[in-house]
């Protein structure tokens, strides 16, 4: 396994930039900033793209500018162009089943109702075997309130917790890319904010 493409899921536009559903994009944006890279819009990949070198390895970055439920269009375009296999892709996304201040890495799995993941799995030939960075945003407690919740902006204290987990995930990214997933998982999963 070699991570060659890191994707941060989001909805496009200023009105969504600070919403919980864009937590994946917050991670990719911080990653680019840490490594002094600028994300540039590339229409052929339907998103903002960048490139990092981690431990001598080239890693592409992507924040789709499609709506969340069409994220797979951007991911498939970039993966096809650079011949990147699903198992070499890391997709960062908001996760209702984790609390703010926590993040988890995993390989494969279902989409858990997340429309961005659902479309990516479909566009990668129904292949769910890509890595996920699940960024905790919590759950509103009622499934009927989920849409409003993910499209809402977290209060300041909650956003600080989400940002602290993203910050730790960025620190673990080089371990994931240059060493191994288990080491990165152990460090990230042990993280506690504060």
Curated annotation (Swiss-Prot):
GO CC term (a single one): cytoplasm
Keywords: Cytoplasm, Hydrolase, RNA-binding, tRNA-binding
SUPFAM superfamilies linked: Peptidyl-tRNA hydrolase-like
Catalytic activity annotation: an N-acyl-L-alpha-aminoacyl-tRNA + H2O = an N-acyl-L-amino acid + a tRNA + H(+)
A single GO BP: rescue of stalled ribosome
EC number: 3.1.1.29
Residue numbers binding tRNA: 16, 67, 69, 115
Active-site residue list: 21
Domain of life: Bacteria
Subcellular location(s) of the protein: Cytoplasm
Site (Stabilizes the basic form of H active site to accept a proton): 94
Keyword set includes Transmembrane: no
MF annotations from Gene Ontology: peptidyl-tRNA hydrolase activity; tRNA binding
Disulfide bonds: none
Described purpose of this protein according to its UniProt entry: Hydrolyzes ribosome-free peptidyl-tRNAs (with 1 or more amino acids incorporated), which drop off the ribosome during protein synthesis, or as a result of ribosome stalling.
Family, per entry: Belongs to the PTH family.
Subunit composition and interactions: Monomer.
Protein name: Peptidyl-tRNA hydrolase
Species the sequence originates in: Sodalis glossinidius (strain morsitans)
